[in-house]
Amino acid sequence: MAELVLYRRRFIPDEKILLKDDKVVSVSDDAIVTKWEVLTKRHDFTHGMSCYYIKEGFKVSKFLDDNDNIVYWYCDIIETEKDGNTYTFNDLLADVIIHN
């Protein structure tokens, strides 16, 4: 299988970002699991994992600190566009944050 290309599109601000450093952990017809480092340095978390539930239209992310402690869970409502091995995840601006 060809390597996946992942993008995140936001509408506010209007941007489409290649998730070039995300590592794909698993792929199925229903879900894509990734692990990642932050794009911009932060003091509260440094890395995490995300599961994109493609058919259901949401993403659940686990945000972790330097010691792998869970800082919070983050749920995004998304719409997924697929073109070959390229996925664009459109953030529909309805989010839920669950703090530990």
Predicted regions and their residues:
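A short, structural micro-pattern
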Residues: 18, 69, 88-90
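Conserved, surface-exposed functional patches that form binding/active-site neighborhoods
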Residues: 74-100
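A short, structured loop/turn motif at beta-sheet edges
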Residues: 26-29, 68-69, 98-99
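Generic preference for hydrophobic/aromatic residues in regular secondary structure cores
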Residues: 4-7, 60, 96-98
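Charge-rich, low-complexity N-terminal segments
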Residues: 1-48
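Short, surface-exposed charged micro-motifs
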Residues: 23-24, 50, 93-97
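Aromatic- and glycine-enriched beta-alpha-beta binding-site module
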Residues: 45-83
